[in-house]
UniProtKB/Swiss-Prot annotation:
Keywords: Sporulation. This is Small, acid-soluble spore protein I. GO terms for biological process: asexual sporulation; sporulation resulting in formation of a cellular spore. It comes from Bacillus anthracis. The keyword GTP-binding does not apply. Belongs to the SspI family.
């Protein structure tokens, strides 16, 4: 039996408001649980696919700077 994690995450947050999405993201990060990482990855994938080139560049700069700390 195959489990579609991407589909499950998207179904779970589909239709959420910005506040609900923020709560989901903050909760996942603050919990520090490894099991939350795939869900955050799916959300990042949505952001990346919907970002223009300038937004992608800005995200990469932010990521690069964050990894230097």
């Amino acid at each position: 039996m195959s489990f579609n994690l991407r589909g499950a995450v998207l179904a779970n947050v589909s239709g959420n408001t910005q506040d609900q999405l923020q709560e989901t993201i903050v909760d996942a990060i603050q919990s520090g649980e490894e099991k939350m990482l795939p869900g955050l990855g799916v959300l990042f994938e949505v952001i990346w696919k919907n970002a223009d080139e300038n937004e992608k560049h800005e995200m990469l700069e932010t990521l690069e700077q964050g990894l230097k700390k």
